[in-house]
């Protein structure tokens, strides 16, 4: 039923990430090594925000210890990786809500365990529920 929608969403997200990656490659050369690794982790998280990422796995990909990655990530982004990922998921969810997706579908596509989990994070971050947000946007 939603297969075509999911595929088109996946392809548009992939195209967006590829364009960002090409732009960021030029900028990355000028960054310190630790910051380049943090940017790479951000790109990995952004490429699959619906997935549950493990800190040890991300650290291994960029050649850092989990503890060092955690410190460096927070230093350069202001948030630990999980909090950054939740914020990224919420930004993605706003886009999907504006496109007319149902709240339960948005929760699933953005990697929240269920609609209630999504609503809690949404309200904590934005001060209203997704339904209230949609009611005020219309």
Regions found by a protein language model. Give the residues of each.
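Short, Lys/Arg-enriched, Trp-marked, Pro/Gly-tolerant hinge/linker segments that flank
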Residues: 1-7, 11-62, 75-83, 87
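Intrinsic low-complexity/disordered segments
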Residues: 4, 65, 112-114
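Short, charged alpha-helical segments
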Residues: 5-8, 117, 121
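Terminal helix-turn-helix DNA-binding modules in bacterial transcription factors
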Residues: 42-47, 52-56, 75-115, 119, ...
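Alpha-helical residues within the helix-turn-helix
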Residues: 60, 71, 75, 108-109, ...
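Short, basic/aromatic-enriched C-terminal tail that caps enzymatic domains
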Residues: 127-136
